């Protein structure tokens, strides 16, 4: 599968939409825009091709679902009742776009050296990032949006699965509600986990649909955490960062873990077992 074949495959799957496809050969991207208002999304084809080698049709299904929902929500809808809206925070990499294609700046807050907090209008099956222009429609200030989002993220259930590797404990939150990584902002929950830790607590948000917490009790744990975050980072539809964060009473500090030349620590079976555990938890 190459980028041209992927382009054609996506166009065939999405031909029922009232959209226009724009292929950029140099950037290897496919932009899909609504015909009525020219709003749309851009897909990086080379990244999807890489994921296709392992995930096959699953990644195609996910991309098509994402595009269909995004295009549907980009209609010029009118928000009539602010009491009915749900605003949530979402975590993005610092390299993520700072403004819309129309030039409207997104409402955002600096979070760490690796991450920023954006704010989203929850639309049920998807959400729309809030920009400064939308604030007028919502009749809200940026500060009100931030306060509402933090209040709402604290109400989310923080159900997790656990696994132990060489004496180190790993916690996984993977509800696929779009806000798994956002739970990193629930300081009360993170402090609760820290009180259970016997070693150093690390936190990972490799992509938007997973939050990894770790109780690192020996050197092997650092290497496993580094592998985990990189593994999830490469598989996520919305990757954030492959780095981990040290956590202590509300403070997050990005750390870079140097892998050791130790086959036992780098055993791929460990990563596969943790991934299988996560998938089992998802089904439950």
Curated annotation (Swiss-Prot):
InterPro entries reported in the protein's UniProt record: DUF1444 (IPR010838)
Please give the Pfam families that the UniProt record associates with this protein.
Answer: DUF1444 (PF07285)
Task: List the transmembrane segments.
Answer: none
Record family assignment: Belongs to the UPF0354 family.
**Protein name per Swiss-Prot or TrEMBL:** UPF0354 protein SERP1303
Which organism is this entry from?
A: Staphylococcus epidermidis (strain ATCC 35984 / DSM 28319 / BCRC 17069 / CCUG 31568 / BM 3577 / RP62A)
Q: What is the lineage of its organism?
A: Bacteria, Bacillati, Bacillota, Bacilli, Bacillales
């Amino acid at each position: 599968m190459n980028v041209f074949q992927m382009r054609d495959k996506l166009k065939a799957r999405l031909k029922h939409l009232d959209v226009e496809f724009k292929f950029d050969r140099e950037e290897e991207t496919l932009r899909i825009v609504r015909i009525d208002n020219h709003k749309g999304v851009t897909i990086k084809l080379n990244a999807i091709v890489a994921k296709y080698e392992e995930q096959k049709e699953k990644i195609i299904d996910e991309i098509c679902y994402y595009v269909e929902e995004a295009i549907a929500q980009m209609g010029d809808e009118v928000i009539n009742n602010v009491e009915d809206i749900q605003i949530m925070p979402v975590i993005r990499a610092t390299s993520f776009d700072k403004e819309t294609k129309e030039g409207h700046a997104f409402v955002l807050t600096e979070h760490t050296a690796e991450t920023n907090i954006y704010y989203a209008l929850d639309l049920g099956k998807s959400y729309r990032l809030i920009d400064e222009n939308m604030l007028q429609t919502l009749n809200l200030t940026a500060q009100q949006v931030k306060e509402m989002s933090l209040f709402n993220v604290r109400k989310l259930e923080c159900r997790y699965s656990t696994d132990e590797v060489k004496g180190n404990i790993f916690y996984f939150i993977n509800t696929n509600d779009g806000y798994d990584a956002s739970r990193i902002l629930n300081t009360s929950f993170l402090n609760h986990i820290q009180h259970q830790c016997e070693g150093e607590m690390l936190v990972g948000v490799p992509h938007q649909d997973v939050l990894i917490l770790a109780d690192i009790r020996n050197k092997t744990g650092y290497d496993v955490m580094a592998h985990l975050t990189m593994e999830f980072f490469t598989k996520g539809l919305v990757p954030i960062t492959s780095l981990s964060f040290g956590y202590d009473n509300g403070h997050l500090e990005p750390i870079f873990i140097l892998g050791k030349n130790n086959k036992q620590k780098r055993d791929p079976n460990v990563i596969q077992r943790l991934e299988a555990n996560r998938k089992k938890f998802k089904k439950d």
